[in-house]
């Protein structure tokens, strides 16, 4: 036997060296360039039935080294390349012997070859492990181009209408050096593209995965920026000033000091174009179009970052503080038409027109800290202090009519003038301590929210009865102080029981203590019927148990939440003085399955069961008579709602076909729904609204997204949705009816948008068409059956010539099937802009025109089983404007 073994060893020695240190390097089979970050897995047989192995990562020169002896099976892999296997045998009595197995060549996959494009001799991107590294110098950009122009050219990256970034259909966030970017995504429009050395795209693992090495299913897709050293610790920003016809202006300044240690943010805004823009640390909110208005605001922020080394790990920490002051004025004219369905063919109609004006002063302070004292502990603190002072005025006229068989006959009119004053102070804070150990983590955290507010209202009502031709006047005054306290301590434990099975447990306590008082007077006399005292206490305990189970490419995540809740409400109003106590226990299971078919394909299945309880106040038999023509009341017989929801999604990106597909299907069923039910008394023209429980809804939705690149210049996009459901509501009840009549509403809602895009050299163009239909059918009010159409089609065009950019967009909106003739119309919206880039692209002058044909009417409609509404309001449109923007660029050091 010994002689046989010796012979075998001699034979093997002719082919292999004797060593227990294996080294080599990984290179590209075509370019012979090294591949840093390649994964080298080795598996060694110990006995006939047992194996051991590990993984090493190639260094910055593509080299790798590991210790072993005996027969070893190697498998080398890298994202974008085909895997390669190699068998090696190391036999040695010395720990100093080294076997250099030379270069292992990987061939780039056909999919990656389709994605790689070369400008000149520079690669647009390279692969480092699972990270794609983009080279900005390989992209064709104009001098002075901003970072956002570069990012939008990255293969697989898209920006939606709100500016949110997506990578192959997944939302992404920007980081710098692996840490969150101070200034957020707003910074990308200010930073020059030349300041970026490279951009890395990768899935950032959760801290738990970084510590344990096991996939917990939580990861973020990030674009990580590496800034050239000469561009750090410098100021960047934009300054914009503009004018629109009819004496409207807008101006803002956004400045950011880009730094890895001490970034600073400064923002200022002034406009009267109804734009609302707030910027703080980690927050950026912008909205427009809600009526008319003006705003002036200023804010700033500072962050200090520091790090230290512990072993082979870098511990990054920071603290930040930001704050601002905003002054906001809003005003608008608006209107609403409402039809309430009665049993049979009859119905009522009301038309409301109004004018609202509000004023608000809003100072805000935020603070945040993330501290890593060592590699196993992380402490996080966050707090926000916000105060609002507001005042408002409004005028509202409502005319009610009833169906007389020959059209609507007006019955009563109410004019309401309201003056309001108030203030609110809110403190929100949260914190956590997370400790990581070998196979899991322990997190202890909590939050506190406290709100103190007080409002005052002066209300004058004039009610005119057309039948008696009599008018009455009411003067009302209400003072309403309130406070809310919410405490939310929690503890979370996560433990990998094995390499493929993680157990997680979570406990959360919710404590609420709310107080609302209202003192109400009518014509100077205390009005007990509309004054109340409301005390609400709630304590809830929630224990959630879940698992993460990894089986190959499949991940299972079962979970169940057990909640016990006790509510206590003391409510006093007029003759009603009651105490309501409700204790409930509920179980809410959920299940999630994720199958990563490939790196670019995944299937996800979800199931959840939820219980929704009506507010405790809704279950008290109170009556609110503050509006004499519209009374609200509670209902002690409301039921809980239980909802089952099933969802399946499939996402795939096929680079070789330039194709992205997303499919989603969802079905939801609820046993009970709580809706508002109306009663109407023709003798007094008074409506009463009361919550009622009705049979639950059934809803379904199917969505298919298709994005296909056709050659180098064309792109086809299609977004198909099919939605439907069954809902219930009560018809408006009359005194002559002994019981409410249930009305079933069914809906089938197909929606499809097809877009063809062209992008080549200096021209970008798109044509699109959207079909949007909603087929509504009612069991007890069949005269309301209709099919609503909201179709649109149009085109957009952009041309770049030297320093000029010309854009135009034309969209035709078509509405049909509505009861209101004002809704059934076609609107043609047309906009044009010309931008002139000056000062070596550091500045631009823009001339623009919006809604040239004056067609935008800002109308919308909604329809339910018991009511239909049509609404409209003022908005800023049909104007010509000019603006100038200057980019502040720092010179390199």
Please give the residue ranges for each predicted region.
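Membrane-proximal, glycine/serine-rich, low-complexity loop/turn segments characteristic
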Residues: 19, 29-32, 61-63, 75, ...
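Short, ordered, surface-exposed loop/turn motifs in non-cytosolic proteins
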Residues: 30-46
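Short, acidic Ser/Thr/Gly-rich low-complexity loop/linker segments typical of extracellular
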Residues: 46-63
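Outer-membrane beta-barrel translocator domains and adjoining extracellular loop/strand segments
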Residues: 212-213, 268, 277-283, 331-349, ...
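Outer membrane beta-barrel strand-and-loop segments of large Gram-negative receptors
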Residues: 353, 486-488, 528-532, 633, ...
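Signature of Gram-negative outer-membrane beta-barrel scaffolds
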Residues: 502-602, 779, 784
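Conserved C-terminal beta-signal and adjacent last beta-strands/turns
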Residues: 751-773, 785-893
């Amino acid at each position: 036997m010994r002689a046989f073994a010796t012979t075998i060893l001699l034979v093997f020695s002719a082919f292999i060296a004797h060593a227990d240190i294996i080294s080599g390097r990984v290179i590209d089979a075509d370019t012979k360039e090294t591949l840093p970050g390649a994964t080298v897995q080795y598996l060694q047989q110990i006995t006939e039935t047992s194996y051991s192995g590990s993984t090493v990562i190639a260094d910055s020169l593509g080299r790798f080294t590991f210790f072993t002896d005996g027969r070893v099976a190697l498998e080398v892999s890298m994202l974008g390349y085909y895997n390669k296997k190699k068998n090696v045998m190391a036999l040695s009595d010395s720990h100093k012997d080294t076997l250099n197995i030379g270069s292992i060549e990987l061939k780039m996959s056909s999919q990656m070859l389709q994605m790689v494009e070369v400008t000149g001799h520079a690669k647009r991107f390279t692969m480092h492990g699972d990270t794609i590294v983009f080279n900005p110098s390989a992209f064709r950009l104009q001098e002075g181009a901003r970072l956002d122009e570069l990012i939008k050219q990255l293969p697989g990256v898209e920006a939606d209408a709100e500016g949110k970034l997506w990578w192959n259909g997944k939302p992404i966030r920007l980081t710098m050096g692996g840490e969150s970017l101070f200034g957020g995504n707003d910074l990308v429009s200010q930073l020059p593209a030349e300041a970026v050395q490279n951009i890395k795209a990768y899935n950032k693992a959760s801290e738990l995965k970084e510590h344990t090495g096991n996939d917990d299913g939580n990861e973020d897709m990030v674009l990580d920026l590496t800034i050239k050293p000469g561009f750090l610790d410098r100021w960047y920003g934009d300054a914009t000033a503009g004018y629109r016809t009819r004496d409207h202006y807008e101006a803002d300044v956004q400045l950011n000091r880009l730094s890895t240690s001490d970034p600073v943010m400064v923002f200022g805004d002034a406009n009267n174009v109804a734009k609302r823009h707030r910027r703080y640390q980690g927050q950026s909110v912008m909205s427009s179009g809600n009526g008319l208005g003006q705003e002036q605001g200023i804010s700033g922020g500072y962050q200090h970052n520091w790090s230290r080394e512990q072993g082979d790990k870098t511990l990054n920490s920071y603290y930040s503080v930001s704050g601002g002051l905003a002054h906001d004025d809003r005003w608008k004219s608006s209107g609403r038409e409402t039809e309430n369905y009665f049993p049979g063919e009859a119905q009522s109609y009301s038309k409301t027109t109004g004018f609202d004006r509000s004023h608000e002063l809003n100072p805000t302070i935020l603070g945040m800290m993330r501290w890593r004292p060592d590699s196993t502990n992380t402490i996080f603190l966050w707090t926000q202090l916000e105060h609002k002072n507001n005042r408002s005025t409004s005028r509202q006229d409502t005319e009610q009519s009833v169906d007389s068989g020959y059209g609507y006959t007006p019955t009563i009119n109410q004019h309401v003038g309201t003056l309001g004053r108030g203030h609110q102070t809110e403190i929100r804070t949260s914190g956590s301590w997370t400790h990581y150990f070998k196979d899991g983590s322990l997190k202890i955290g909590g939050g506190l929210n406290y709100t103190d507010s007080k409002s005052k209202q002066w209300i004058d009502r004039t009610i005119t009865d057309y039948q008696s031709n009599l008018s009455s006047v009411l003067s009302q005054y209400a003072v309403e102080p309130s406070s809310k306290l919410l405490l939310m301590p929690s503890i979370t434990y996560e433990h990998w029981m094995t390499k493929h099975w993680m157990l997680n447990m979570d406990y959360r306590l919710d404590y609420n203590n709310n107080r609302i008082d209202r003192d109400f007077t009518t014509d100077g006399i205390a009005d007990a019927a509309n004054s109340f005292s409301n005390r609400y206490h709630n304590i809830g305990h929630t224990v959630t148990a879940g698992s993460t189970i990894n089986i190959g490419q499949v991940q299972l995540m079962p979970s169940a939440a057990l909640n016990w809740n006790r509510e206590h409400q003391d409510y006093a109003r007029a003759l009603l003085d009651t105490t309501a106590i409700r204790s409930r226990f509920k179980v809410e299971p959920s299940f999630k399955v994720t199958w990563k078919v490939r790196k670019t394909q995944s299937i996800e299945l979800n199931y959840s069961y939820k219980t929704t309880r009506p507010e405790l106040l809704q279950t008290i038999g109170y009556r609110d008579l503050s509006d004499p023509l519209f009374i609200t009341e509670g209902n002690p017989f409301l039921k809980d709602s239980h909802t089952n929801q099933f969802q399946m999604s499939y996402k795939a990106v096929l680079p070789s076909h330039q194709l992205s597909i997303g499919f989603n299907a969802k079905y939801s069923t609820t046993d009970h729904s709580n809706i508002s039910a109306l009663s109407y008394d023709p003798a007094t023209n008074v409506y009463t609204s009361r919550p009622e429980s009705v049979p639950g809804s059934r809803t379904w939705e199917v969505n298919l997204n298709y994005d296909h690149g056709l050659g180098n210049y064309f792109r086809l996009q299609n977004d198909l949705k099919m939605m439907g459901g069954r809902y219930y509501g009560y018809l408006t009840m009359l005194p002559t009816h002994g019981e409410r009549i249930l009305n079933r509403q069914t809906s089938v809602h197909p929606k499809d948008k097809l877009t063809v895009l062209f992008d080549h050299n200096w021209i970008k163009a798109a044509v699109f068409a959207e079909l949007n239909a909603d087929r509504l059918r009612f069991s007890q009010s069949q005269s309301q059956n209709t099919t609503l159409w909201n179709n649109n089609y149009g085109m957009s065009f952009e041309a770049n010539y030297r320093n000029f950019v010309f854009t135009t967009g034309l969209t035709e909106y078509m509405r049909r099937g509505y009861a209101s003739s004002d809704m059934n119309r076609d609107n043609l919206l047309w906009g044009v802009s010309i931008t002139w880039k000056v000062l070596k692209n550091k500045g631009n002058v823009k001339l623009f025109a919006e809604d040239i044909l004056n067609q935008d009417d800002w109308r919308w409609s909604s329809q339910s089983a018991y009511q239909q509404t049509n609404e409209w309001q003022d908005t800023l449109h049909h104007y010509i404007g000019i603006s100038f923007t200057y980019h502040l660029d720092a010179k390199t050091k």
